[in-house]
Design a protein with these regions (language model features):
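C-terminal non-catalytic interaction/assembly regions of soluble proteins
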Residues: 48-152
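Accessory alpha-helical/coil subdomains and C-terminal extensions
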Residues: 1-55, 62, 148-152
Length: 152
């Protein structure tokens, strides 16, 4: 345990399919994903916490290619309320990688302390408890029941 006071989940809540989990693959097209009913997105990374961020279809249009995670982040930001985009398993030094650094600087939220499965379940619970925005981010970064298995 992290030594912090434990958080107990005594409130009733109902899990729903409001977290979209995306596992990256070569040729992914983010236009194929529907955002209806989505409260949070959990996006995996390639090895070493890297991802495809090829920014533009062409330099003149400044439109993101639909195969770049930046296009997904833009869609998330345009939703009301904005949909938080969590990246997992995202190493603490991921800012050192150009590709991952770009998406993190654009506001994606790194998760590196938990397994993929635990991160997904915790996001489901956080959304079911009604957390959004900063509150959801704080919930994800607070250890509740020894779920943080990766440490410095």
């Amino acid at each position: 345990s992290s030594g912090e006071e434990k958080m107990y989940l005594y409130r009733d809540f109902e899990l729903s399919s409001c977290v979209l989990r995306i596992i990256p693959y070569v040729g992914i097209d983010y236009e194929h994903y529907c955002m209806k009913g989505v409260k949070a997105i959990l996006h995996g990374t390639y090895h070493s916490s890297t991802m495809a961020v090829t920014p533009y279809k062409d330099d003149e249009s400044k439109r993101y290619t639909s195969q770049a995670i930046l296009s997904l982040k833009k869609r998330c930001d345009e939703c009301e309320p904005p949909i938080p985009l969590f990246l997992e398993h995202c190493h603490r030094d991921a800012y050192n990688y150009i590709s991952t650094g770009i998406i993190l600087k654009c506001g994606a939220i790194p998760v590196w302390t938990m397994t993929s499965e635990m991160t997904y379940v915790k996001l489901l619970v956080g959304c079911a408890l009604g957390y959004e925005g900063e509150e959801l981010k704080e919930f994800m970064n607070r250890e509740i029941n020894d779920e943080f298995v990766y440490r410095d």
